[in-house]
A protein has these predicted regions:
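Structural motif
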Residues: 55-56, 109, 220
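Membrane/wall-proximal cationic-aromatic binding patches
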Residues: 17-80, 90-100
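N-terminal Sec-pathway targeting helices
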Residues: 1-16
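Secreted/periplasmic serine-hydrolase-like ester/acetyl group-modifying domain
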Residues: 114, 125-218, 299-318
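Second-shell loop/turn segments in exported
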Residues: 58, 83-87, 192-198, 222-228, ...
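Membrane-embedded segments
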Residues: 59, 63-143
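Flexible, glycine-rich surface segments
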Residues: 183-263
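C-terminal regions of proteins
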Residues: 236, 245-305
């Protein structure tokens, strides 16, 4: 009888441990966060910025973080911005980061890169139903890496040199590697990418739109050039969504001739992300839109922004 009870006792103890650790590793307010490590790192990094000095915020997944370079916007237009994007970042995580940042900043504009809208923005892994069930029951199985972010300085959150350098670049990943895209220039017509917008996506898009309205932030949506990810059908899907919320949508995939992108030199990974060559062209074009259409001020020469010139000179990106 005692032998029979041992496995049961062990199982009960294990369940209790999983329940307790699940409670401990899920911080209050983070119940709907997919990647706590990424969200923590972003929140801590942007908190280093002087209060109420950022006029533009960029957010999205890696299409955003590999494209929008705050120091290029600063050097060319004097625009103070920050890139909140991150690798595979889901819309629910974008929302959590934005919500925190708006406690300390009063930006005029939020630029949401649209590729993240096609992600499954659920908190748990939906690719494996058993794993999803287990993660929902015991969140510690999902958030097991959170210990890496506890009691670490901001430059160690995320714990890679590349992440630390991106934090210095105000969220931008300055990647120079070249792997050419050799597919069709007519990718918008030929691509057959899934156009599904999942319920969680629609929920969090509305939450972001509402949060922007509450804080007097104008929301715009942008698709950066990416032969791997974009098509006319996807464009139409995002345009329809933006129309519902009266949000302006810029699809830069439609401006290949204007941007003068060269897909043999301007992509990091065969047409998925832009490298630094490509991002320079996109930012040079888009900074003019921010200046002319949205009247984002030029802060160069102002005492409160002297640190920007110093940081830009130290990085020497442009």
């Amino acid at each position: 009888m005692k032998k029979a009870l041992k496995p049961v006792s062990f199982l009960l103890v294990l369940i209790c441990l999983l329940m307790v650790t699940s409670y401990l590793v899920t911080p209050k307010g983070y119940e709907n966060v997919y990647d706590i490590q990424l969200v923590n790192r972003k929140i801590n990094a942007v908190s280093q910025e002087k209060e109420n000095t950022l006029d533009v915020l960029f957010t999205g997944d890696s299409e955003a973080s590999n494209t929008f370079s705050p120091f290029q916007y600063w050097k060319e237009q004097g625009i103070a911005s920050y890139n909140l994007g991150g690798s595979a970042q889901r819309l629910n995580d974008c929302y959590t980061v934005l919500e925190d940042v708006l406690k300390h900043q009063k930006p005029k504009l939020l630029v949401l890169e649209a590729n993240t809208l096609f992600r499954k923005n659920a908190v748990y892994n939906q690719d494996d139903s058993v794993l999803m069930w287990a993660e929902q029951l015991f969140p510690v199985l999902h958030h097991h890496n959170i210990y890496k972010t506890i009691n670490l300085s901001v430059n160690l959150l995320g714990a890679t040199k590349e992440n630390a350098y991106a934090d210095q670049c105000k969220g931008y990943y300055a990647r120079v590697r070249i792997r050419p895209y050799r597919g069709s220039d007519q990718y918008m017509k030929t691509n057959k990418r899934d156009t599904t917008l999942y319920p969680e996506t629609l929920e969090y898009f509305e939450k972001i739109a509402d949060l922007c309205k509450e804080n007097n932030v104008e929301l715009i949506v942008v698709s950066v050039p990416s032969p791997k990810n974009w098509s006319d059908a996807r464009h139409d899907t995002i345009q329809e969504l933006c129309n519902q919320y009266d949000v302006t949508y810029y699809d830069l995939n439609k401006l290949d001739n204007v941007l003068a992108l060269d897909w043999t030199t301007d992509t990091l990974d065969r047409g998925d992300h832009l490298n630094m060559n490509g991002s320079k062209k996109v930012n040079a074009y888009f900074s003019e839109i921010l200046k002319e259409k949205y009247h984002i001020p030029d802060h160069r020469g102002e005492a409160d922004y002297a640190i920007w010139d110093k940081q830009e000179a130290e990085l020497n990106l442009y």
